[in-house]
Curated annotation (Swiss-Prot):
GO MF terms held by the record: nitrilase activity; nitrile hydratase activity
Catalyzed reactions per annotation: a nitrile + 2 H2O = a carboxylate + NH4(+)
Source species: Sinorhizobium fredii (strain HH103)
GO biological process entries: detoxification of nitrogen compound
Domain CN hydrolase: 4-270
Matches recorded under InterPro entries: C-N_Hydrolase, C-N_Hydrolase_sf, Nitrilase/CN_hydratase_CS, Nitrilases_CHs
The protein's name: Aliphatic nitrilase
Family: Belongs to the carbon-nitrogen hydrolase superfamily. Nitrilase family.
Enzyme Commission number, as recorded: 3.5.5.1
Keywords for this protein: Hydrolase, Plasmid
Residues of the active site: E44 (proton acceptor), K130, C164 (nucleophile)
Function (record text): Nitrilase that hydrolyzes preferentially phenylacetonitrile, but not (R,S)-mandelonitrile. Also acts on dinitriles like phenylenediacetonitriles (PDAs) 1,2-PDA, 1,3-PDA, and 1,4-PDA, and cyanophenyl acetonitriles (CPAs) 2-CPA and 4-CPA, but with lower activities.
Length: 308
């Protein structure tokens, strides 16, 4: 089986309503399946929300009661992994027969993580926690470790996620290429014109399919209770999308789209990967391990280790 159809979902969550967002996600999964998709990618922080324009009312050297409450409200929208929400998503993946990458805000103890969840028709198959929150994201998200760099096997090759500006970390990309990634999923909150160029570069560099999804987010899709430092105009666009699919030779086969909520699809052929690797394999015949070598630590890093 070499040919398949991929989908990238461009949409926004329902503000302050996890149950409604899960329901919307399931409906979008069904819509992607109805359009013949075998694989679908959702944006970064789709479930739980990307706090675009928020700063939790923080100041250097001081926090405020208002900001603490904003964070508590935001945390309430995060999900446990695994949990009841992942069970619902797993059931939807099973019924649709889809392989999925979905961006969520994961709650683990007192810390939130920006996480990509992997689902197969058999259920929840793994996750990747964002290693490096960008800029002010560090106000609300913790740092993942190397233990969640796994990929998931599909009938069309291995699928994995690199989240937003992790894609600008050359060693992170190389680690994924070393795993033989075929379906390189890039959930993002970056809606700039330059993002499409980044996705094309990665497809060429890794000789893989790149599937990137970004939210189409307006102010009214953003929680009213959370202060927004960009705008309070309800129809103002905070994230304009830019969903895109690129083949292993860097050719754009769908998108980028900035028109609103949508699902883009493309028919792909995994035989394009060996054809592209004929003249370039970044971790194979085009590598120089005698000169350059990457060491990846995938051991979990726990703050408390108990030994008997």
């Amino acid at each position: 089986m070499t040919k398949f159809r991929a989908a990238v979902v461009q949409a926004a969550p329902v503000p302050n309503d996890v149950e409604a967002t899960i329901e919307k996600t399931i409906n979008l999964i069904r819509e992607a399946a109805a359009r013949g998709a075998n694989v679908a990618v959702f944006p970064e922080a789709f479930i739980g929300g990307y706090p675009k324009g928020a700063n939790f009312n923080i100041h250097i050297g001081a926090r405020t009661p208002e900001g603490r409450q904003e964070f508590a409200d935001y945390r309430a929208g995060a999900i446990a992994v695994p949990g009841s929400e992942t069970e619902q998503l797993a059931q939807a993946a099973h019924e649709a027969g889809l392989y999925l990458t979905i961006g969520v805000i994961e709650r683990d103890g007192g810390t939130l993580y920006c996480t990509a969840l992997y689902f197969t028709p058999d259920g929840l198959a793994g996750k990747h926690r964002k290693l490096m929150p960008t800029g002010a994201e560090r106000l609300c998200w913790g740092f993942g470790d190397g233990s969640t760099l796994d990929t998931v096997q599909t009938p069309w090759g291995s699928m994995g996620a690199v989240i937003c500006w992790e894609n600008y970390m050359p060693l992170m990309r190389t680690a994924m290429y070393g795993k033989g990634i075929a379906l390189y999923c890039a959930p993002t909150a970056d809606d700039r014109d330059s993002w499409a160029a980044t996705m094309r570069h990665i497809a060429l560099e890794g000789r893989c399919f790149v599937l990137s999804a970004c939210q189409y987010l307006t102010r009214k899709d953003f929680p009213e209770s959370m202060g927004n430092r960009i705008t309070d105009e309800p129809d103002a666009v905070l994230m304009r999308g830019g969903a895109i699919i690129v083949d292993p030779l860097g050719r754009v086969v769908a998108g980028p789209d900035y028109s609103g909520e949508t699902i883009l699809t493309a028919d792909l052929d995994t035989d394009d990967i060996p054809r592209a690797q004929f003249d370039f394999d970044v971790v194979g015949h085009y590598a120089r391990p005698d000169v350059f070598k990457l060491v990846v630590d995938e051991e979990p890093k726990s703050a408390v280790v108990t030994r008997a």
